[in-house]
Amino acid sequence: MWKTKLDETSHETPVTQQNDADLISAEDEERILFGKKDEHTEKMLKLKLSIHHSLLDRLNLAMLEQTPTEQIKAQISSILPELLADFDEPLNREEREKLVQELVDELMGLGPLEPLLADETITDILVNGPETVFVEKRGMLQPVPTRFQDEKHLMRVIQKIVSAVGRRVDESSPFVDARLADGSRVNAIVAPLALDGSLVSIRKFAKSPISIAKMIDLGSVPEQMAPVFEAIVKSRRNVLISGGTGSGKTTLLNAMSSYIDEAERIVTIEDSAELQLQQAHVARLETRPANIEGKGEVTQRDLVKNALRMRPDRIIVGEVRAGEAFDMLQAMNTGHDGSMTTVHANTPRDALSRVEQMIGMSGIDITSKSARAQIASAINVVVQVGRLSDGRRKIKSLSEITGMEGETITMQEIFRFRMTGRADDGSVLGHFEATGIRPKFLDEAESHGMHLSPELFRPDMKLG
């Protein structure tokens, strides 16, 4: 199988170096945003395409997988002068090195995407046709000068991605989800659904999980809240993490899971494996889409039901989207305390409404009042996460479900983030604060040896 990343030597070439403060030049930004093309860039793209075709004829493609990258570079470098004979512009040393690296990327990896995949500061790569690429860096989207020769070039890269995982994408099956060898998630959609060129969205997979300590360093979580999260997990409260797309739900879920005891058996269930639990006893399950004939699908609901037969101490579902929410609540209510999941919602109250809707999708004949009672008895804590306008991800609130009043689920907010203004550089100013409510889970935390200072919950207490 081909790999999506080269060895560490590939990071040393000039093409992969980006300045954090200024990802692209003003000229590149003008070209990207207004369609202006640089003549030299056009020539280099055509040259690379021509040489790439020549290399396909000359190199032993069957042996490339077993050949070290440096050896491939040497082979390309040795025949490059001959291949450049008809090129009317001489290349300097830096341009030659860059060209060799790009040719290696074409042969062994994902072509123009390789430098972006190698850049650890980039979290998302968004390809809008062959000539427009955006990345997310430090929480903000920005254009990059990366481009493909044409739509055919982009489609070759897409086919390389999907064929490696036994999938296909074409006019009859115009969108697909896949995963790169490093775990990064990929969604591709092509014509006729994509009107202006094929679209690729890559959510990069973190090499190492982000811990609560790292989230504190990033300002996502105030230091004083770390023991609160620890108490919630160790006292086996069932947790629902709510937030929008890209708000950091899975990141927080992964970080909170680090407080689970090593002796516990954890079963994780995901549509696309992202969780990186560090405990020794973790059973990881992943859904399977239907094949080309529409058969063989295994859903999250199937896996949640099966997980109950696997003697789990806790069940962690990466994200509930449909009828599996009912089975997850059943698990939380039947001895699997301390289970956790996430949901797409903009507020804690919306999160509970979404879960109620999902129960309705399960096909179970249940009244709204009964569904809400299930939710109120199963979920103990709702953590709301979000992305601020400056791109930073924050814990926005921590709430506790307290029961039912009539047909309404009752909930109390324990902590919240309060925005107070903006700095000169546009960054959001604010602080976390306690609401003055003493959470009910403190008693359970005490019984598990977790002692949280009452000062932490004073109404005038500002956290971070």
State where each predicted segment sits.
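Active-site phosphate-binding and catalytic loops of NTP-dependent enzymes
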Residues: 63-66, 86-93, 108-119, 161-178, ...
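N-terminal anchoring/assembly modules that precede and organize ATP-driven motor systems
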Residues: 1-142
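NTP-binding/hydrolysis catalytic cores, primarily Walker-type P-loop NTPases
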Residues: 391-464
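Conserved P-loop NTPase nucleotide-binding/switch module
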Residues: 269-283, 307-406
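Conserved lysine of the Walker
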Residues: 249
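P-loop NTPase switch/communication element
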Residues: 206-217, 254, 258-305, 329, ...
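P-loop NTP-binding catalytic core
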Residues: 119, 127, 132-235, 453
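Hydrophobic anchor at the beta1->P-loop junction of P-loop NTPases
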Residues: 241
